[in-house]
């Protein structure tokens, strides 16, 4: 019992770092082209893109999509080199093209200190580090507007390239049922409590040993004390491989950028309702 309580208090300490993530702007606002990426500022007044551009890009930047997308979002020069212009914007029946001179820098989640993933299995998380990967999609999900913008990347001749943007209403997205659930889960405290299993498994660091993990259980009565601060309004997803609309499990990953934070929430679909059954920190 003492070890379980110690683990629970440790989770509070780990998750409390999430509380300052809420941005001052409305989450559905696009990042302005002139916005500064905090992690890249070295000298006041200098353009962070120019600072990054001065650093030589390793050939290894294309080996893992996980590495590439961060460089793509932070380096203006690299981004312009890795877009197939004119870039197709596919909105179903309507198709348009963006010319090179009209493109605005897309920073994705770099204005935050975290990004998110939605997967069916733990194995799909590891695909970001699969050197054999040849296609990936970054999804910009506007929960309030029920709208998804997809950025399609393909690795061509060893180089990752943005080849297309697709706009779709949320119901057309393979994750639509879960996204509708998540939107209510993070905005309605009563619904959130009703969406908890009677016992929520957790896995976290052992307070007595930095090299070990320990397991325990959180009951709904303790959830308010331990729940992480989850993003609302705008979230991102990186899709590697196939999405399965009929999957009865979804893992929502909240991963810090350069701060070591990682929280995984595992939901299971039971009798037509999503329930949180596990949290890993």
Model-identified regions with their sequence ranges:
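Coil residues (strongly favoring Ser/Thr
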Residues: 34, 39-40, 50, 63, ...
């Amino acid at each position: 019992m003492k070890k379980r309580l110690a683990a629970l208090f440790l989770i509070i300490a780990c998750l409390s770092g999430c509380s300052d993530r809420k941005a001052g702007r409305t989450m559905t606002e696009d990042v302005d082209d002139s916005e500064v990426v905090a992690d890249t500022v070295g000298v006041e007044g200098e353009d962070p893109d120019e600072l990054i551009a001065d650093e030589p890009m390793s050939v290894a930047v294309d080996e893992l999509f996980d590495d590439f997308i961060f460089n793509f979002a932070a380096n203006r020069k690299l981004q312009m080199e890795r877009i197939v212009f004119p870039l197709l914007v596919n909105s179903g029946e309507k198709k348009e093209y963006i010319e090179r001179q009209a493109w605005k820098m897309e920073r994705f989640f770099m204005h935050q200190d975290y990004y998110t993933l939605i997967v069916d299995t733990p194995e799909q998380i590891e695909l970001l580090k699969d050197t054999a990967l040849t296609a990936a999609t970054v999804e910009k999900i506007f929960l309030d507007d029920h709208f998804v913008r997809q950025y399609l990347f393909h690795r061509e001749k060893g180089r990752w390239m943005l080849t297309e943007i697709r706009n779709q209403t949320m119901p057309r997205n393979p994750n639509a049922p879960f996204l509708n659930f998540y939107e209510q889960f993070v905005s309605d405290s009563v619904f959130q409590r009703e969406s908890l299993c009677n016992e929520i498994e957790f896995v976290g660091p052992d307070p007595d040993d930095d090299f070990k993990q320990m397991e325990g259980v959180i009951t709904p009565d303790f959830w308010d004390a331990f729940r992480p601060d989850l993003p609302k309004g705008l979230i991102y997803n990186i899709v590697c491989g196939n999405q399965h609309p009929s999957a009865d499990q979804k893992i929502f990953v909240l991963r810090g950028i350069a701060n070591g934070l990682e929280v995984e929430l595992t939901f299971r679909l039971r009798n037509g309702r999503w329930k949180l059954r596990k949290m890993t920190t």
